[in-house]
Amino acid sequence: MLTRRALVVQSQGEVQVEEIPLPTLRDEYITVKVKAVALNPGDWKMLYGPHATPGSILGCDYSGVVEKVGRAVNALLTPGDRVAGFAFGGCPYNHDEGGFASYVTAKGDIQAKLSDSISFEDAATLGVGITTVGQAMYQALGLPLPPAIIQEAASILVYGASTATGTLAVQYAKLTGLKVFATASPHNFDLLKKLGADEVFDYRDPECGAKIRTVTNGLLSLVFDTISEGSSPAIWAAAMGAKGGKYTALLPIKNFPRSDVKVTTILGYTALGVKVSDHLPANQKDFEFSAKFWKLSQHLLEKEKIKTHPVGVRQGGIDAIPQGLQDLKNGRVSGVKLVYKID
């Protein structure tokens, strides 16, 4: 029996590296020999939160080399291809899912084939970000997909722009022809301006929202909030123009501050076309859109139109990931995405 090493949830807050069977390849899936994985805030929240499921494998972001391709995969992938993709980390319904493993089985159409110019470490940062940007900006906000650009003069606020998802959002927004306003800590201003942000504001400034509203002449109508908690609702509500607009969040917002804004909360897992919860059944529409967006993103990566997020590469492989999750949980990681090489 073929096996793999994986980071498996034991109970809420507890994980262990286990040697487990390599699952039978499903028709829409590929098997990837993992070369690197990246950590996201959602990973530690899944582990320490109420939805931690014993037996599930953590991790969403990975890169590696294709070993097998299921017969129903539409993406043009063959064994030996270098890829990066998105997995359902902590899946409560199918414990074959999850990215923190020596081998991953993942939806074959939610992948990008990589050129040799991008390292596995850099590519491992892409999975959650590409999936989320596609859902938030192009499905929820209704922006035209590149190379098409928005016809009317328009701007967008990317709140939390220095996150791995935020840096991608800034770049896609520029490719779509938007003027991009962003919030971040001051030490990340230069990075965001290099990626295309027109102006960046300190989210800790009590006047942040008012300043954005002034600079945008009260016309801001699009917001993508990558944080969706803390001070973010108050800031974007103050920044948005009098006519309201559209707002996309990654978490549900309680006590929503404005009634003239269309609010959409997205969840990346729905892009996989599988059951997420009893309230979120498999969504084929989200899957088909995400497959299309990943194909587009592969093209943009090949043309070097998209740059990856800064990484902090750590040694130790799968065994060292629990410490990284602790560091993320305790706020010890800033400005980089933690990446682990997998032997």
From Swiss-Prot:
Quote the Pfam families the UniProt record gives. Answer: ADH_N, ADH_zinc_N
Q: Which SMART domains match?
A: PKS_ER
* Family annotation (Gene3D superfamilies): Medium-chain alcohol dehydrogenases, catalytic domain, NAD(P)-binding Rossmann-like Domain
Q: Which InterPro entries match?
A: ADH-like_C (IPR013149), ADH-like_N (IPR013154), GroES-like_sf (IPR011032), NAD(P)-bd_dom_sf (IPR036291), PKS_ER (IPR020843), Trans-enoyl_RdTase-like (IPR047122)
Binding residue positions for substrate: V128, G129, I130, T131, T132, V133, G134, Q135, G268, Y269, T270, A271, L272
**Enzyme class, first EC level, given as a word:** oxidoreductase
Null mutant: what phenotype? Targeted gene disruption leasd to a reduction in ACT-toxin production and pathogenicity, and transcriptional knockdown of ACTTS2 using RNA silencing results in complete loss of ACT-toxin production and pathogenicity. Does not affect growth rate, spore formation, and spore germination.
Pathway entry: Mycotoxin biosynthesis
What UniProt keywords are attached to this protein's entry? Answer: NADP, Nucleotide-binding, Oxidoreductase
Q: What is its EC number?
A: 1.-.-.-
Record-annotated residues binding NADP(+)? 42-45, 162-165, 185-188, 203, 333-334
Q: Give all cystine bridges in this chain.
A: none
Q: Which GO terms describe its molecular function?
A: nucleotide binding; oxidoreductase activity, acting on NAD(P)H
Name the domain of life. Answer: Eukaryota
Function statement: Trans-enoyl reductase; part of the gene clusters that mediate the biosynthesis of the host-selective toxins (HSTs) ACT-toxins responsible for brown spot of tangerine disease by the tangerine pathotype which affects tangerines and mandarins. ACT-toxins consist of three moieties, 9,10-epoxy-8-hydroxy-9-methyl-decatrienoic acid (EDA), valine and a polyketide. ACT-toxin I is toxic to both citrus and pear; toxin II the 5''-deoxy derivative of ACT-toxin I, is highly toxic to pear and slightly toxic to citrus.
| Subunit structure, as described in the record | Monomer.
Family membership noted in the UniProt record: Belongs to the zinc-containing alcohol dehydrogenase family.
- Further remark: Gene clusters encoding host-selective toxins (HSTs) are localized on conditionally dispensable chromosomes (CDCs), also called supernumerary chromosomes, where they are present in multiple copies. The CDCs are not essential for saprophytic growth but controls host-selective pathogenicity. Although conventional disruption of ACTT2 could not be accomplished due to the high number of the copies identified in the genome, the high sequence identity among these copies of ACTT2 is likely an advantage for RNA silencing, because it allows knockdown of all copies of this gene simultaneously.
What's the protein called, per UniProt? Trans-enoyl reductase ACTTS2
State the organism named in the record: Alternaria alternata
